[in-house]
Amino acid sequence: MIELKDVQGFRPDYEIPIKRAGIKSFKRRVKLNYNNESFDSYVDVSISVSLNPDRKGLDMSRTIESVRSSYNLNDVAYDIYNDLFSRINYSSSGYVNVSFDFYYNNKIYPVSLIAEGDKNDVKRYVEVSAEGMTVCPCAMETIRSIMLYDYNVSYGDIGISHNQRNKASLKIQYIKDAHLERLIDILESSFSYPVRNMLKRYDEGKMIIEAHKRPKFVEDVVREIAYKAAFMEPEMNLYMDVRSESFESIHPHNAYAEIEDYTANIRSYLKNR
């Protein structure tokens, strides 16, 4: 019988520890169970572990073997993480990211479920992205002043401004339930107005009017998302990262804002309001 050498177990030429070694963008079809229903989805999986300085490489095939064909959606990254560490005994920490499209309210949202950390202290995160419309409040007030001063025209509550398509994401630690629908609702309600795949003329006009009633900077978007997310679990202190990017209509560059903090800190900033 042929004897195959375990080259991954050799000592490397340069004994330097590696933070992450593994696979990226492994795609497969899995069945996900969620809220008493199940659906098939093509997932994109990235898996990595730390390597000690005396080990040349990771047993890559074991990362693939750790991905099954069916999961509870809330536990998919966590279960892959635990399955992987049942197959290897030479690493102390790991990272698993499972990304897929989630269908909700006739729209598709990118979702990532993440498990990472030391094998005895694994933390779970969910990240959801959505797109919406923002209306610049500074331009609105500037135009309001110009129209009154130069043209003697006074606007009511709704002024003129330039608009942006905004992409926002919310990454937050969770314990058992990823609360995908709640997170999506938080994102969608924090724009000037959510975007739609199809609009008839009247609906388009109403959408623009409603958006101009709620003008927002990119900074306003991340603050509102952070505020709403911080009170989802008011007794817990969870890591959170909120990002928002506005694709400018009058500039060749984009506007960006980010909040990275813990939910207890967010609540403490607002306790005297």
Swiss-Prot record:
PANTHER family the record matches: GTP CYCLOHYDROLASE MPTA (PTHR36445:SF1)
Annotated gene: mptA
Catalytic activity: GTP + H2O = 7,8-dihydroneopterin 2',3'-cyclic phosphate + formate + diphosphate + H(+)
EC primary class: hydrolase
Protein name, per record: GTP cyclohydrolase MptA
Cofactors that this protein relies on: Fe(2+)
Cofactor info, note text: Binds 1 Fe(2+) ion per subunit.
Family recorded in the similarity comment: Belongs to the GTP cyclohydrolase IV family.
EC number: 3.5.4.39
